[in-house]
Amino acid sequence: MPVLWLADVDKNDIPLVGGKGANLGELLRAEIPVPDGFVVDARTFREFIQKTGIAEKIYSLLRELDVEDTEKLDAVSREIREIIEKTEMPEDIEREIREAYRKLCEEEGKEVYVAVRSSATAEDLPDASFAGQQETYLNVVGEDEVVEKVKKCWGSLFTPRAIYYRVQKGFRHEDVSIAVVVQKMVNSEKSGVMFTSHPVSGEKKCIIEAVFGLGEAIVSGLVTPDTYVYDRVKRKIEEVKIGEKKFMLTRKDGKTVKVELPPEKANERVLSDEEIEKLVTLGELIEDHYGKPQDVEWAIEGGKIYIVQSRPITTIRKEKKEAEEEVSEEAEGKILLKGLGASPGIASGKVKVIFSEKEISKVEEGDILVTTMTTPDMVPAMKRAAAIVTDEGGMTCHAAIVSRELGVPAVVGTKVATKVLKDGMVVTVDGEKGIVYEGRIEKKEEPKPVVASAPIITATEVKVNISIPDVAERVARETNADGVGLFRIEHMVLGLEKHPMKFIRDGEIDRYIDLLYQEMKKVVKAFYPKPVWIRTIDAPTDEFRAMEGGEDEPIEANPMLGFRGIRRDLAEEEHFRAEMRAIKKLVDEGYTNVGVMLPLITSPEEVKRAKEIAISEGLPLDKIEFGVMVETPAAALILEDIIKEGIDFVSLGTNDLTQYTLAVDRNNENVAYLYNETHPAVLKLIERTIKVCKEHGVKSSICGQAGSYPHVVEKLVEFGIDSVSANPDAVQRIREVVARAEKRIILEKLRKI
């Protein structure tokens, strides 16, 4: 059934209804005032592209795409969206959407205005802030228009910015689907956004931004909103900052129109103290329901507050970074501009002023991007920029959200940045204080408080997962991880100009080895002398097929169960030997902190043969660590036999272990809801693996996504795991979880004495 009502869904339905849909359902169940609506679920989009035969055409266009080529990215995006919008919707799907809209209208006895919003299955999730990549259509009325906008939302899964973000975040296009939320519109007199805790520091301070009319003016950065800061500890309004709201967006004749506001209205306070307190109360209820700080969208109509969206805040820093830079007081230069410090950090560089996405090619690596307000299409330039400064916007505008996610300093709402700052000027941007200084300013290091910033020491090592060698130095510095528990080299291999075997067939094996060595060295050097476990290539055939020379890759019904991991390594022995030679070059240079990790092991014979090849290539296994991943029930159940072949460590790959144990394809939205790393069967295999490792003196670790989940990590520590490897943004949080779990275990033992 393609349509699900919001009242019938909850957080467990994310694979079906996406982040937005699931969150709205959760709010309704918590009795939060949310406008009624329904979701066209993600299975329907899949059914649409499969039934109409357009799926292969879409994904083939994406496989060959270089997302850094802006012009080609735009062209491919346009072509895909045109294919979707011009393809006729299957009759049964269209009929159900029309019937659901009619039912929504029955309560009021007339056609109602609705908002039609995309709800991507990777959007609004706790570990990825996708900053509004997909589209929202407001003031939609009538069955025909609803059907049309649903198709446009499907197409918005392939906007340039959405495609670009997925590649940057490591999401495969085929793995991300899209649901569409159709929800009654609130004809808001006032609206805005509320962070239930500070979006950067995490302090118990509620930040509310408000405008007259529709809230789209805030997120788009079209106006500078009022900002209210409410101290949740002292229970009082701490700060009121009135923004200059030159116009408002409102509904007129079924369209969103821009209405100029007279100066007295533009500078009028939007919210009363009473309204602020009511919003804070609702925000606290929502935060308590989810158990974590929330980014909440709200609207007021006829004096009643409605919550139209809530998502987790993904940008809170767990602690101030060690040696975080600040502008030296002695060296503070002339202040050119002041605004809101929207994303912390200090950066100096040359100014590049742009006024539209057509000019983003002007912005080079290390420039200071200055604009009226960023748009999602400017993200490639934002990624290159050292810092971002805007005329307009508040703490929840596009520039602020994306800058925090990218880790780029930003100052927003300066009002006159594009007039004061000129191309070529050298400035320093302080994203903490919200100040832009003239010239390149000397920086000072923040003294490290002896107690407040004391490092957390744990017996269980906390390592980090790395996919992109270019970020290794920064990740090593910022996380202070105990090493790399998973270095996925297939990501860098898939980024080469041709298939690994084509290098070999073309007689360029030495060049291929050198390319591997150079990229591996970036990671091994950044973390030296801490261990770096390099996983040999584990990409499925469908990813290799898109490369030049990959035409001979087998076409498999389910590549995740096919020719990958150790199977490919041993079948394409020349390629595996090349990997071993690249690692040997590192060892010969003195980088004995490397470890070799074999993926998808199912038998001792695979380990034995891999070791024979490594030794024959001169790899000194007495100097480095050699281990395996436990990703299959087979490996977990015969681990004793695998250990006999001589290994130093075992790492649990819980992503695959979970789906192989439960017979669930985690990328299939029809069954993804069954995917559960804490299923008793999965936990028994994990516990068994750790126990067997302890009995045989072999190190145990985890590098799957579950290693970034606090509730799973607590169990791993209880089981006695030696190390946990988490995603970079989760390392500090996991370190805290590990420390708490270890303390609890010690206390429990003491109580028994």
From Swiss-Prot:
List where this protein forms a coiled coil: none
Active-site residue numbers: 398 (tele-phosphohistidine intermediate), 703 (proton donor)
Reactions performed catalytically: pyruvate + ATP + H2O = phosphoenolpyruvate + AMP + phosphate + 2 H(+)
GO terms of biological process kind: gluconeogenesis
Free-text comment about domains: The N-terminal domain contains the ATP/Pi binding site, the central domain the pyrophosphate/phosphate carrier histidine, and the C-terminal domain the pyruvate binding site.
* Function of the protein: Catalyzes the phosphorylation of pyruvate to phosphoenolpyruvate.
Alphabetized NCBIfam families for the sequence: PEP_synth (TIGR01418), PRK06464.1 (NF005057)
- Name of the protein described by the UniProt record: Probable phosphoenolpyruvate synthase
**What is the native source organism of this protein?**
Archaeoglobus fulgidus (strain ATCC 49558 / DSM 4304 / JCM 9628 / NBRC 100126 / VC-16)
